[in-house]
């Protein structure tokens, strides 16, 4: 049974309280590197991405440099990541689009970001919120699993439904903190198998809600 808005907000804010200092775990120094790192993180751990990106960014530090590289050259730096051939293809095309459509700059709106090759709603939301400080809520596998496990949404909810529900429950200034905290919570506590959430009864203490 899906929780009420007040109870769902309580659960999420207790998760934020467990990880108040949660920060992005991808390494990046600018908007282009953030965009590339998030694109690479699909079906791959952030730790694996962070091992690959120093060499990738040293070789191709700008959209211009990446656009003139071959797919094979790009792929050689990310070959240990999942779906690396497809990712190399998307990175090259995305870099060219940045040059052609956005003067080599990473755009800030969801519509413009999603016009780029290999960029879906989750990636756009991460770039907007982490890179530009624009309120957005990204739903990855951790966030979706946690929201379903704790009845914030129904078990059949789509990622978009999860996103809209959390954005309805929380004020915009808490969206990024919730996203980051849920990732840490998912890695450390709310595992796909054998979740340890019961060790944190404060999540379910609705006496003051």
List the model feature ranges, each with a label:
Residues 2-209:
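Catalytic cores of DNA base-excision repair glycosylases
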């Amino acid at each position: 049974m899906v929780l009420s808005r007040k109870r769902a907000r309580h659960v999420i804010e207790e998760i934020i309280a467990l990880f108040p200092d949660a920060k992005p775990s991808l390494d990046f120094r600018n908007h282009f590197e953030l965009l590339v790192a998030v694109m690479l993180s699909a079906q791959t751990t952030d730790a694996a991405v962070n091992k690959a990106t120093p060499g990738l960014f040293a070789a191709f530090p700008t959209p211009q440099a990446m656009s003139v590289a071959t797919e094979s050259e790009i792929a050689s730096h990310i070959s240990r990541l999942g779906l690396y051939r497809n990712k190399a293809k998307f990175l090259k095309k995305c870099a060219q689009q940045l040059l052609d459509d956005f003067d080599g700059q990473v755009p800030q709106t969801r519509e413009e970001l999603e016009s780029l090759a290999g960029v879906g709603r989750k990636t756009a939301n991460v770039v907007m919120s982490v890179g530009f400080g624009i309120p957005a809520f990204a739903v990855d596998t951790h966030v979706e699993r946690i929201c379903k496990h704790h009845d914030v949404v129904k078990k059949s909810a789509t990622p978009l439904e999860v996103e809209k529900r959390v954005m309805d429950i929380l004020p915009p200034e808490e969206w990024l903190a919730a996203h980051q905290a849920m990732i840490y919570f998912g890695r450390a506590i709310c595992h796909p198998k054998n979740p340890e959430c019961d060790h944190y009864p404060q999540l379910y203490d609705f006496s003051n809600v």
